[in-house]
From Swiss-Prot:
The keyword Mitochondrion does not apply. Residues 1-19 form the signal peptide. It comes from Lychas mucronatus. Expressed by the venom gland. Disulfide bonds join 31-79, 35-55, 41-62, 45-64. GO terms for biological process: defense response. Residues 21-80 form the LCN-type CS-alpha/beta domain. PROSITE patterns: LCN_CSAB (PS51863). This is Neurotoxin LmNaTx19. Binds voltage-independently at site-3 of voltage-gated sodium channels (Nav) and inhibits the inactivation of the activated channels, thereby blocking neuronal transmission. Keywords: Disulfide bond, Ion channel impairing toxin, Neurotoxin, Secreted, Signal, Toxin, Voltage-gated sodium channel impairing toxin. The keyword Thylakoid does not apply. Has the structural arrangement of an alpha-helix connected to antiparallel beta-sheets by disulfide bonds (CS-alpha/beta). Its main location: secreted.
Length: 90
């Protein structure tokens, strides 16, 4: 009986754990969010429920820390591809 209580308690602890990840934010057309300053990225990351964020100037992209698992942090390297056709939206 004690083992059952211990197993249930451990399962509840595992279920309650929310995993967080770090990474670059991508928009709906697989482009990273460009930046020049940390404040913009901090606000953008916080709006996505991240713990924090900053502008990584080497890539001019917003990098977020502590993002929820459901946020997109990987792209397909096809930023904006197929979004415009001869200057007009599809």
């Amino acid at each position: 009986m004690n083992h059952l209580i211990l197993i249930v308690a451990m399962c509840l602890m595992v279920i309650g754990v929310q995993c967080l990840k770090d990474g670059y934010l991508y928009d709906d057309v697989d482009c990273k969010f460009s930046c020049w300053d940390n404040e913009y990225c901090r606000k953008l990351c916080k709006s996505k429920k991240a713990v924090g964020g900053y502008c990584w100037r080497w890539r001019f992209s917003c990098y977020c820390t502590g993002l929820p698992d459901n946020e997109k942090t990987e792209g397909t390297y096809k930023c904006g591809q197929g979004r415009f056709l001869m200057g007009k939206d599809k």
